[in-house]
Regions:
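Positively charged n-region of N-terminal signal peptides that target proteins for export
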Residues: 1-9
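C-terminal motif of bacterial Sec signal peptides marking the signal peptidase cleavage site
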Residues: 16-20
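A residue-level marker of the well-folded mature domains of exported/periplasmic proteins
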Residues: 27-284
Length: 284
């Protein structure tokens, strides 16, 4: 089961590289430690232990296939299971649209009751409930993607895992900076696009004021500044990972305030749609 556990982590983490909600806060109770955890004793291809047919993993997901962040996880998980010869029905328990409240704990426990040896959650707000379940079920490996408390918890069966998504946000900022430079050098910006200090205004739609969101928009901002130094950034939070209307309205407000670039760390296309509509209307 060590190989199964590690590869499921790898594919899920690779999937996260392409989406917007994530944490850079992986700690020592992360993929490498999880893969080598002595408590994980089953095997997948010979020797003593259980076979693939006996392996079952639970996936407690904050959204479903209609939401980009969770969809990327689903694609990664199904790819991993296919590579390992696992059946996405027989070897998995799926929990969709699980909010960041006590129902997350209930969903994890139900996965355990159905025979899961490892359970993954995929949202920062799931973390405390995942830790609670790990404390009560030491025989089960529980992975919180994202998160930052596994190391401090001291629990050998509780892990955090995620990609360093802030690196991708820095690259996105570099691309945004190139566009800003093009617009500024070409004289295509109006007075409303500059603040009182002569900085070009940019905006950012964030889900929550969590460390992972702050690190993401900081990386984005630094990426922009690496290309075009004179910028200022306004951040608006929606207090939700997935709120199409809220994200759209936040982006509209930023555009109305003169922001020429809008980044985001949330799960829907709301902000992007607002930018597309503004461009089509010729307002930005």
């Amino acid at each position: 089961m060590k190989r199964l556990f590690a590869l499921l982590l790898v594919f899920a983490m690779v999937a996260c590289l392409f989406v917007g909600c994530g944490s850079n806060g992986s700690d020592d109770n992360s993929i490498s430690n999880a893969a080598n955890d002595n408590n994980v004793t089953a095997k997948d291809d010979g020797g003593s232990g259980t076979s693939n047919a006996d392996f079952k993993a639970g996936f407690v997901l904050v959204g479903d296939e209609n939401e980009g962040y969770t969809y990327a996880h689903i694609v990664g998980i199904e790819k991993a299971m296919g590579e390992l010869g696992l059946d996405k029905s027989a070897n998995a328990v799926w929990k969709y649209s699980v909010p960041e409240d006590e129902s997350c704990y209930d969903a994890i426990v139900d996965c355990i009751d159905q025979g899961c040896q490892v359970v993954f959650t995929n949202s920062y707000g799931h973390q405390s409930f995942a830790q609670q379940a790990a404390e009560e079920h030491p025989e089960v490996q529980i992975v919180s993607m994202t998160g930052d408390t596994a190391k401090r918890s001291g629990l050998p069966n509780f892990h955090n895992a995620f990609t360093k998504i802030f690196e991708a946000r820095y690259v996105a900022g570099v691309v945004a900076g190139m566009k800003i430079k093009e617009l500024a050098d070409g004289g295509k910006l109006s007075d409303s696009n500059y603040d009182a200090d002569g900085n070009v205004k940019i905006g950012y739609v964030g889900a929550y004021p969590y460390a992972e969101v702050v690190s993401g928009y900081t990386a984005f901002f630094q990426g922009v500044k690496s290309v075009y130094e004179k910028v200022s950034m306004e951040v608006q939070y929606t207090n939700s990972w997935f709120d199409i209307t809220g994200e759209n309205e936040a982006a509209v407000a930023l555009i109305a305030d003169g922001c020429v670039i809008v980044g985001q760390h949330a799960d829907s296309t709301g902000a992007a749609s607002a930018c597309e509509a503004a461009l089509s209307a010729g307002t930005t």
